[in-house]
Amino acid sequence: MAAGLVRMNTPGYAELHCLSNFSFQRGASSADELFRRAREQGYQALAITDECTLAGIVRAWQAAKVHQLRLIVGSEVQLCDGPKLVLLVENLTGYQNLCALITRARRRAEKGAYQLFRDDLLLHHQGLLALWVAADSGDTATGAWLRSVFAERLWLAVHLHRGSDDAVRLQRLRALAADVGIRAVACGDVHMHVRGRRALQDCMTAIRQHCQVSEAGRFLFANGERHLRSQAQLAELYPLDLLAETLVIARRCQFDLSELNYQYPRELVPEGHTPASWLRELCEQGMPLRWPDGPSGKVRDVLAKELGLIEELGYESYFLTVHDIVAFARSQRILCQGRGSAANSVVCFVLGITELDPMKHHLLFERFLSRERNEPPDIDVDFEHDRREEVIQYVFRRYGRHRAALTAVVNTYHAAGAVRDVARALGLPADQVDALAKCCGRWSDRIPDDQRLAEAGFEAGSPSLRRVLVLAGELIGFPRHLSQHPGGFVISQQPLDQLVPVENAAMPERTVIQWDKDDLDMVGLLKVDVLALGMLSALRRCFDQLQHHRGRHLTLATIPSEDPATYAMISRAETMGVFQIESRAQMAMLPRLRPQKFYDLVIEVAIVRPGPIQGDMVHPYLRRRLKQEPVTYPSPQLKEVFERTLGVPLFQEQVMELAMVAADYTPGEADQLRRSMAAWKRHGGLEPHRERLVQGMLRNGYTLAFAERIFEQIKGFGSYGFPESHAASFALLCYASSWLKCHEPAIFTCALVNSWPMGFYSPDQLLQEARRQGIEVRPVDVCHSDWDCTLEPDAEGTLAIRMGLRLVRGLAEADAKRVQQARSQRPWRNVEDLCLRAGLDARARARLADGGALRALASDRHQARWQVAAVQPQLPLFADVQALPEEPVQLPVPTVGEDLMADYQTLGTTLGPHPLALLRARLRALGCRSSSELQGVEHGDNIAVAGLVVGRQRPQTASGVTFVTLEDEHGMVNVVVWRALAERQRRALVGSQLLKVSGRLEQENGVRHLIARRLEDVSPLLQGLDVRSRDFH
């Protein structure tokens, strides 16, 4: 039969069984690829039926709208006690039942698995159409049971893939359908949009089965027929009535995700109030706390405007929900602060959600909420990182697990992971797999080029290597698995599984929905971000210690503002441990920018970011700040927008204001411009604004050159344009931590170490910095140390830091707590008394002895190890028998070097001499200067230094430059390694613990760094000292 005749007689087709890449290592094509191809093939509809998941259905919905093809929502499931089915959603009831089925199946199984039974179908089958995927010899009893459940909503799926037995298979399946009394329908069991994805699909199958493709055997498909075939090809395989039946089913499936009716929680509103009246009441209660002398008329006007828009858009319950969570945290003395665009809102400020007065800082409300956008605002709240779980569990208790769950995060393949998985699947040796994966950047989405491959010892033209790289390139960006969002909550009035499936999280006592934040935005579901921030934990500890040791009660709101000493410290870049300005890039900027007031900190936080740097905004701003070029404005109207930043746009809000003032954008249009800035590289979303923006500016009298330059600067924001509200929220924590470091450095350092892990620096670096500042740091001692580091005042009130037992590597907190509890009853008599009364096992005793924590009871580590080894469990029969005194054993005292080595191995730090102090003579012989000697070196001089590598950073803004931080006995040396040198001497750069650097010293505006010319690994000089860098590996 001619192909043209086949096409004429084809009744049309809808694919009812198709897996996307959200089937996680089964489907080899994205929803966008599938819908584009289905549209090209003239399909009437396409069902996405990923196995027991709806994780990709929102993206499929978006793809369907883009390609103007109808989506049928569905899922493939395998019953534990029954057949394989494809369930298709007919209406809203069917969608709710499918969500409930998937939820049941996922919640009763381990993460990544599911268990679904016949009884589940009996409870949740209404509104669902079922396609029975039966073997050729499927039993009629199963069919009869299915028909009893689904009645006329049951079909037999017929999959034909050009197998040698297609004709027999078709005949048997038709007979089975007739025996059961149901209709048959054509299905493709589609796993890819085109045949060309067959190799990737085979590879993904091997990855899923944890084997090589050559070993996958029966798990692989026999051919590449599971793609979206043309209707002519389908007509060659299927009888026309089976093809026509696909359209009958498609016409019945009328559900659309736009039908979801999300409802906010309602129980937060007391009797006698509406959500709107209760929100207004809470705002009235909050105003005296924010403005003790009463709010100004302008504040009341803005508050009324915000409340009016919130009520108009129906978001009152959203604000009440966030307020309730924050109120709980404050009731438990958990420090928290809203950040991001919420800081633009006066309502959030008076509710206590944010700590920054948006009126005082001229923040733009439209960045937070606008009528045109008509979607829920996004409120992010940071909580102390070590107490956030209390807040998460409160939300679960408050709303129940059936109404509250965490959002998902879609973990996708980056280049390294894709290369690693594909290379394994294709059978490359393990050492080659590792070497090839290391050729990719950690988070890069680019396959390594030929030069990088050659440097790693690969033959770039090798066919086997090319195959790995091609398939890995196809896999990049595919979903790998779902994980839980750190704290993004979805909370609803109705059970969540009426909206989206819910499954168990990897962590106990948590549940997670199958959608991520982008999915939620698309369907309009409420999300509250309960995030963790280590600095809040440290600040709360600081405030507690200030109250205890100084009798001074401070909060974020009452820390003395605009303190000259604090800004002087910041301008000297003495900011180790300070929030947001402790990185080497920030420290290099501080002496140039020299912050003198709070808004300078807002700029400092925002300026060392990809957006301002790539938009060429940093250097013009600095030149104007240093009065090296005049401050000019294109018009008086734009002066109001840019005056705070000296005529240079630095913030997203300024771009929005510019568009409104200079190009006549409405606030909602300006917000769409902001959103497009973030997406333009991925979706080209900014180009439609070029003409609108440029023409609007030309109409208002601006030059074409100025308009084009502004547009290019806006594109720079696409990488990471920082919101002013976000920078201001962070600047508040930056200032608070700076003030504490300046005025209470012992308290600040103690709090940082107790809150670790957080920030850039290890406890060793923080404690050594404290010692350089003249703060006494006292050793770990079972006679004085608690689990946390503590503060011990002397007679004059000067505080010393007592190192806590938390620093002893391998010691459990429970053991430390038992030491504290037993010691509170009476002092230790000796090592044996400690071990027995504290109930320490052999492991805990050894950790304390090795960590030097027993010096007060045993003179040194050698004696301590000997004495803990001699402790015998006390048996009840001999409890009152006095042991015979033993002769003390004289052991050699450890050398300084041995103690130093043991300190680093067991504590990660030392209170003895710095390792480089012991090596200084040998380093001088190698021509190395110390950090303290650099003050006398002239700009441009060639010198050599050596130090412990305590940090390596390669910011994405730095064009491949690596910043290395070296530490010696006097301080830090900042080293700049250009890309060419880094690639040439990668082994020394990446692998050194003790690094010698030769290069040229540069000094400008108080910033000093060494431009590396040669790197040399001199780690053998350490003779095994345990010093670990914190870097980008």
UniProtKB/Swiss-Prot annotation:
Source superkingdom: Bacteria
One biological process term in Gene Ontology: DNA replication
Localisation per UniProt entry: Cytoplasm
Primary residence: cytoplasm
Cellular component, GO annotation: cytoplasm
Keyword Acetylation set for record: no
Residues annotated as signal peptide: none
The keyword Transferase is annotated on this UniProt entry: yes
EC assignment: 2.7.7.7
Record's catalysed reaction(s): DNA(n) + a 2'-deoxyribonucleoside 5'-triphosphate = DNA(n+1) + diphosphate
Record key words, sorted: Cytoplasm, DNA damage, DNA repair, DNA replication, DNA-directed DNA polymerase, Nucleotidyltransferase, Transferase
GO MF, any single term: 3'-5' exonuclease activity
UniProt similarity note: Belongs to the DNA polymerase type-C family. DnaE2 subfamily.
Function description: DNA polymerase involved in damage-induced mutagenesis and translesion synthesis (TLS). It is not the major replicative DNA polymerase.
Protein name (Swiss-Prot/TrEMBL): Error-prone DNA polymerase
